[in-house]
């Protein structure tokens, strides 16, 4: 047979196209608690229910990081530098109802606080709420120069730092130690505790940038369904906040 006479060439290998993974997904809207002005956070994807794998079980306990500037749109600078962590607790009527899971400030805001020639006071305290939560609250504060001060630095003595720490502990205990979690979230979102901390420390020495920089949920109660319904009812949240202000 002549060379090249075999016309049976190699078969073409056709590559199998991978299907789009998002064709098997469904989207659930995420709803924030009633303490915030803009409650619709966005949507979260989850694989559709198939066999023993239920979509609502997979989506439970998901944690979302949301900027406070999106939850409470406004002109306040600190809103855009604060993050809230919200966790899915229940999927009802195709919506993910979330609950408070923590708070933090952004990394660039935290890095911009530090300057030369001042003292940094960093304090944390475990605070139990009236409805069974245990929160770890971190507070940061910096000393500042007095008016018409010639010295460039503003370092203070150890006894002044101890007095500042004691003032922070006392203010946190008075403001957050005897409240429920809905009232606590309201106080964190409108920076009411930051103003109280600044007022308490200004009586001791000059200070700046006194704020709660982080809140961590250490322990939560087992049965939170009743509390979740309270946090997503705007009327009940408003009544709790008004009742707390009247008591104070």
From Swiss-Prot:
Gene Ontology MF terms in the entry: structural constituent of ribosome
One Pfam family cited in the UniProt record for this chain: Ribosomal_S3Ae
Superkingdom to which the source organism belongs: Eukaryota
A single GO cellular-component term on record: cytosolic small ribosomal subunit
Key words of the record: Cytoplasm, Ribonucleoprotein, Ribosomal protein
GO biological process: translation
Location in the cell: Cytoplasm
Keyword Cytoplasm: yes
Coiled coil feature spans: none
InterPro entries: Ribosomal_eS1, Ribosomal_eS1_euk
Xref: HAMAP family: Ribosomal_eS1_euk
Family of the protein in this entry: Belongs to the eukaryotic ribosomal protein eS1 family.
Subunit structure: Component of the small ribosomal subunit. Mature ribosomes consist of a small (40S) and a large (60S) subunit. The 40S subunit contains about 33 different proteins and 1 molecule of RNA (18S). The 60S subunit contains about 49 different proteins and 3 molecules of RNA (25S, 5.8S and 5S).
Protein name: Small ribosomal subunit protein eS1
Organism annotation: Giardia intestinalis (strain ATCC 50803 / WB clone C6)
């Amino acid at each position: 047979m002549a060379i090249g006479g075999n016309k049976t060439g190699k078969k073409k290998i056709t590559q199998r196209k991978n299907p789009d993974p998002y064709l098997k997904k469904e989207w659930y809207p995420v709803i924030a608690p009633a303490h915030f002005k803009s409650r619709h956070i966005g949507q979260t994807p989850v694989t559709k229910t198939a066999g023993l794998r239920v979509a609502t079980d997979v989506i439970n306990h998901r944690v979302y990081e949301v900027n406070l500037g999106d939850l409470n749109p406004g002109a306040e600078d600190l809103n855009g530098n604060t993050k809230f962590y919200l966790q899915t607790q229940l999927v009802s009527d195709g919506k993910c109802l979330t609950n408070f899971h923590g708070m933090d400030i952004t990394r660039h805001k935290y890095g911009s606080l530090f300057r030369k020639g001042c003292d940094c006071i960093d304090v944390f305290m475990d605070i139990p709420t009236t409805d069974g939560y245990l929160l770890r609250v971190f507070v940061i504060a910096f000393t500042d120069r007095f008016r018409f001060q010639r010295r460039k630095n503003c370092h203070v003595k150890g006894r002044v730092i101890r007095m500042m720490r004691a003032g922070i502990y006392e203010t946190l205990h008075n403001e957050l130690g005897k409240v429920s979690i809905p009232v606590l979230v309201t106080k964190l979102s409108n920076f009411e505790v930051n103003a109280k901390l600044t007022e308490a420390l200004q009586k001791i020495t000059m200070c700046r940038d006194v704020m709660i920089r982080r809140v961590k949920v250490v322990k939560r109660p087992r049965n939170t369904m009743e509390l979740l319904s309270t946090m997503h009812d705007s009327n009940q949240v408003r009544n709790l906040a008004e009742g707390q202000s009247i008591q104070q």
